[in-house]
């Protein structure tokens, strides 16, 4: 879905503010897709923990030197494909079923990293900063916090056994079956958050994780 010119979103509308920063992380803009992440392109950090990004002219600068003019579209939260596969089978009295599901493409904003990597949360989070792990994370939206949204998950798995009933029992019971079901047995994903499926994919905050998880 793209916004037509008739919607008159000239210059774009910033949307979403998470991670205990005042930065918006998505933009609604004419001719662009819903769910675009918007911010600064990450270029790296120095030995002192200072973050660097790319300016609009392609030069590497400290994040403190970047302005809104340097912001670019960093990717989109919507997956290219969402898929699912389910199967059931039986052998004599034993039955087995499972389902797989997943998504291909799209970016996820790890707001947990953004929030707890922000200096404003150090005191409340009781975090220890030492020469080994000390950094000065930026209070800016950057693709440093964007991760792949591709995943595959083994969802529900059920193993059952149907009892063979004699004629006397059938007077009172049509059938009897015992089964065991397990959920969310395995997830294959490069997302470093809790679960790529817990990320918000509705409303206006597409692809943003929840700092509460």
Task: Label every model-predicted segment.
Residues 23-24, 65-73, 78, 126, ...:
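Extracytoplasmic loops and strand-loop junctions of Gram-negative outer membrane beta-barrel proteins
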Residues 9-18, 113-122, 191-203:
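Flexible, surface-exposed loop regions and adjacent strand-edge segments
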Residues 1-77, 183-193:
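Conserved small-residue
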Residues 101-185:
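Extracytoplasmic gating/loop element in the C-terminal half of outer-membrane beta-barrel translocons
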Residues 41, 86-88, 158-162, 181, ...:
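Outer-membrane beta-barrel architecture
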Residues 79-83, 150-155, 213:
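Residues that define the transmembrane beta-barrel architecture of outer-membrane proteins
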